[in-house]
């Protein structure tokens, strides 16, 4: 009978209901079927007898209970009660529950996300973003809505900027070319692409560049990669004026001064950059951080605030209450027509008050900074007009500071007491305070305190901080006296120095704190207002050193032996930290090239040591070869540094290459570098790294290259000792 019944049911869903009913009577659970409605082509009477069992897993006891109670059967389309649903779910074992498959997120999924549309977007913006992401293949898309900027950007009003990352320089040019062609064919626009090379032009330049590199490698000469227009890494596609979105219902048109009508169209610009160029420029940070959008109400409030501030400053200047008055400035009274004062567009001069003083107090400090000792330096324009000559430290204080500098470090730290406010706990501090009290010029005490704190910070006294040094410099700047360049450079050098407090206990590779670098940049900014040339080689050399690590480092993913000398003498750091340091180096180097800053021998020594300690060997050798092109002689000090760095690094392969290449080059330098005792010591140390058995080979009379060089160095040491005796 059951076989005939199953044969008569042709629908798969109905047959599953029949099987499910028998399993439920046998006290066996079964998951709910996927088909909730029987097939209409099977009109057999067996279907209605099992309709009450449809759509839910159940047990035999529940069916017997429902049959005995005589309750009507529930239709297939009816909903279950919460109690029945919870009771049925309790009896489903874990191995019969349907698992929802969770798709793992792709690692590249975050790079291919399309940014959300802004309010009132142009109609073509969504298609443009879809085409840039899917068809062209730009990653990490970012959309900046600059339509509410006042004043508008230089690219045009109602600007929408799209920023994307290309995979390579070739992909960058291909993507920009395809985008321009798509805009011309689809929307009949005339886009312009700055930095885009034609298809044939790009192929020709790449082919010529490869040919030059091959010829340079054949003649064993260095290939200088100049800016040939290929590796710019940045293409700006200006889509042009497009139809703008519908404005908001309550938006009001802004008044403007000029001719013509207000443009209702929008302008779209697509910035395509390589990953390195995008990290270097940081367009998102420039537009979002430094220039936040301002609404019309914010602009009106800002203009009112500026008017109140300017009127208050003018009243103080007229009444003579201003502490530091500029003799060149003149107080403007009520003769100015109020209609001519419009905040941002004003041309009146009120006690050297500038617009930056209201927008950013840290950029141009206010006059009250000298009185309140705030965190901002006093502008030279607002400083008191005192003597044009710089301050001089009295001779008694100078002798005390010289005596302090000659003491051993532990004794000097003990004599400095417990901090800048301690003036009597030690004999040195009592003598120093007595000399300050007896000084003929009290203003000279400011410079004396600055020198004392600078020496204490240099000695790494725990109670003297770099913030105390910056406060002393602010006091000197507020005094109104001239500050010499040597005093400013010494202060900056101390602020950028490494110290025990510059790193955590867990971080062995010490770096200068970001806050200390900001203090040094504030000092340089103030000195630039005084007319000092801050784009000098001394300043760039200090910034180079402060941007990196204090000790030799290596990437954590280097496959070096744990017992190797290079592993023992270098500190592992993450690749992200190394990339950050190299990015800062590249920016500093580009600024130097733009302003034609030339390094001297002292700066080149520091720069070579810096790049070698950070594992940037390509840049190290580029600077080493560049010195000959600049007609700077590589003297004895440079070769001592070269061999010493390779000996301290402990890399056998690099030490061998250095010896074979640059020991013969010493005799070809102009003037020649002779193998004396100083160079012989570092060359022998480098030989022990390249070949640890070189001494035994030399004693055994081995005629090899390394044993002969060892004997030459040994003879140079013996000759030097003979001359000294």
Curated annotation (Swiss-Prot):
Annotated transit peptide: 1-66
Composition-biased stretches (Polar residues): 45-54, 63-89
Residue ranges of coiled coil: none
UniProtKB keywords: Membrane, Mitochondrion, Mitochondrion inner membrane, Transit peptide
Disordered: region residues: 39-89, 317-346
InterPro entries: Atp25, NT_sf
Superkingdom, natural source: Eukaryota
Bilayer topology annotation: Peripheral membrane protein
Region forming the signal peptide: none
Subcellular location: Mitochondrion inner membrane
Record carries keyword Ribonucleoprotein: no
GO cellular component terms attached to this protein's record: mitochondrial inner membrane
Biological processes per GO annotation: mitochondrial gene expression; mRNA stabilization
Disulfide bonds: none
Record's keyword annotation contains NADP: no
Reported function: Probable mitochondrial mRNA stabilization factor.
Similarity comment text for this entry: Belongs to the ATP25 family.
Protein name: ATPase synthesis protein 25, mitochondrial
Organism: Coccidioides posadasii (strain C735)
């Amino acid at each position: 009978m059951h076989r005939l019944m199953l044969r008569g049911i042709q629908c798969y869903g109905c047959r599953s209901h029949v099987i499910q009913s028998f399993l439920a009577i046998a006290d066996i659970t079964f998951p709910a079927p996927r088909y909730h409605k029987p097939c209409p082509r099977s009109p057999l009477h067996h279907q209605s007898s099992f309709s009450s069992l449809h759509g839910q897993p159940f047990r035999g006891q529940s069916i017997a209970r429902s049959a005995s109670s005589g309750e009507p059967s529930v239709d297939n389309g009816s909903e279950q009660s919460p109690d029945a649903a919870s009771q049925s779910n309790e009896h489903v074992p874990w191995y019969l529950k349907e698992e929802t498959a969770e798709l793992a997120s792709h690692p590249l999924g975050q790079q291919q996300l399309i940014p959300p549309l802004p309010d009132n977007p142009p109609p073509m913006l969504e298609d443009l973003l879809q085409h840039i992401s899917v068809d062209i293949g730009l990653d990490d898309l970012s959309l900046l809505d600059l339509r509410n900027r006042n004043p508008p950007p230089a690219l045009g009003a109602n600007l929408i900027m799209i920023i994307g990352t290309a995979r390579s320089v070739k992909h960058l040019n291909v993507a920009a070319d395809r985008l321009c062609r798509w805009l011309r064919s689809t929307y009949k626009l005339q886009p312009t692409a700055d930095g885009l090379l034609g298809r044939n032009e790009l192929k020709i330049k790449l082919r010529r560049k490869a040919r030059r590199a091959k010829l340079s490698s054949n003649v064993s000469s260095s290939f200088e990669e100049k800016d040939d227009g290929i590796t710019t890494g940045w293409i700006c596609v200006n889509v042009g004026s497009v139809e703008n979105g519908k404005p908001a219902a309550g938006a009001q048109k802004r008044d403007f001064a000029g001719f013509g009508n207000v443009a209702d169209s929008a302008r779209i610009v697509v910035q395509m950059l390589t990953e390195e160029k995008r990290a270097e420029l940081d367009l998102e940070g420039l537009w979002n951080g430094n220039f936040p959008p301002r609404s019309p109400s914010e602009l009106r409030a800002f203009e009112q605030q500026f008017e109140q501030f300017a009127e208050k400053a003018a009243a103080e200047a007229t009444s003579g209450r201003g502490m530091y008055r500029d003799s060149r400035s003149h107080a403007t009274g009520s003769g100015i027509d109020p209609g001519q004062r419009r905040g941002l567009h004003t041309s009146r001069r009120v006690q050297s008050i500038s617009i930056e003083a209201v927008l950013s107090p840290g950029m141009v400090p206010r006059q009250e900074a000298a009185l309140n000792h705030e965190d901002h330096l006093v502008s030279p324009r607002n400083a008191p007009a005192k003597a044009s000559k710089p301050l001089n430290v009295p001779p008694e204080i100078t002798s005390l500071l010289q005596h302090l500098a000659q003491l051993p470090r532990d004794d000097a730290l003990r004599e400095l007491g417990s901090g800048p406010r301690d003036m009597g706990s030690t004999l040195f501090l009592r003598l120093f305070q007595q000399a300050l009290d007896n000084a003929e010029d009290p203003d000279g005490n400011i410079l004396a305190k600055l020198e004392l704190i600078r020496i204490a910070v240099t000695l790494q006294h725990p109670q003297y901080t770099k913030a105390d040094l910056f406060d002393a410099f602010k006091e000197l700047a507020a005094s109104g006296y001239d500050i010499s360049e040597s005093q400013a450079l010494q202060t900056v050098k101390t602020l950028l120095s490494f110290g025990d407090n510059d790193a955590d206990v867990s971080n062995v590779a010490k770096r200068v704190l970001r806050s200390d670098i900001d203090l040094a940049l504030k000092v340089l900014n103030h000195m630039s207002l005084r007319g000092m040339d801050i784009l000098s080689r001394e300043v760039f050399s200090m910034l180079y050193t402060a941007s990196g690590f204090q000790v030799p480092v290596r990437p954590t993913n280097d496959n070096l032996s744990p017992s190797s000398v290079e592993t023992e003498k270098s500190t592992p750091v993450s690749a992200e930290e190394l990339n950050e340091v190299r990015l800062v180096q590249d920016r500093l180097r580009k600024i130097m090239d733009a302003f034609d800053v030339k390094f001297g021998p002292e700066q080149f020594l520091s720069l070579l040591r810096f790049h070698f300690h950070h594992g940037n060997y390509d840049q190290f050798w580029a600077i080493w070869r560049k010195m000959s092109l600049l007609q700077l002689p590589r003297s004895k000090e440079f070769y001592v540094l070269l061999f010493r760095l390779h000996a301290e690094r402990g890399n056998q392969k690099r030490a061998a290459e250095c010896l074979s290449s640059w020991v013969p080059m010493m005799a070809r330098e102009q003037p020649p570098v002779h193998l004396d005792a100083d160079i012989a010591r570092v060359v022998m140390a480098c030989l022990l790294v390249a070949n640890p058995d070189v001494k035994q080979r030399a004693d055994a009379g081995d005629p090899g290259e390394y044993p002969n060089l060892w004997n030459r160095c040994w003879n140079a040491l013996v000759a030097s000792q003979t001359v000294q005796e």
